[in-house]
Amino acid sequence: MAMKRIAVLNVVGLTRSVIDDMPRLREWSKKREVMSFKPAFPAVTCTAQSSYLTGKPVGEHGIVGNGWYDREDAEVKFWKQSNHLVKGKKVWEEAEVRCAKMFWWYNMYSSADFSATPRPLYPADGRKFFDI
């Protein structure tokens, strides 16, 4: 029996009410079962993704925001990438299945079978660009 494939699309602000305005996503979703997650709190990228990937609340996975103050180094650290920062087993580890984790945070040193790590670039004028 073939394993059921699952795709988790993490798109900020995407709700069922706007899928009809997106032709490709609308067609893709018509052929599949579409489900929603309860929004994570706080609603910031790193915390939300860590909650979705572990199934745990912030108090258990430990990622309280996109950055934190490091007392030892006396500096604020933003957008760190090591998967070792996220406490707890990931959903694919619990399910013992193969996983491709593409462009999510905390991808470095992840146990996912396939991954690509985002690398944002911040020019001095305040813009933000994504790269890999």
Per-region residue spans from a language model:
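Beta-strand elements within well-structured catalytic alpha/beta cores of enzymes
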Residues: 3-17, 52, 95
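His/Asp/Glu-rich, glycine-adjacent segments
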Residues: 56-132
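Glycine-/proline-rich flexible loop or hinge segments
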Residues: 7-11, 30-36, 44-49, 66-81
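Short, exposed beta-strand "edge-strand" segments with a Pro/Gly-rich flavor and a Y/T-containing core
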Residues: 4, 41-44, 84-89
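Detector for methionine-enriched segments
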Residues: 1-3, 22, 35, 102, ...
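Non-transmembrane alpha-helical segments in soluble domains
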Residues: 11, 26-29, 53, 89-93
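Short, structured active-site-proximal loop/turn typified by the sulfatase FGly-forming signature C/S-X-P-X-R
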Residues: 17-60, 100
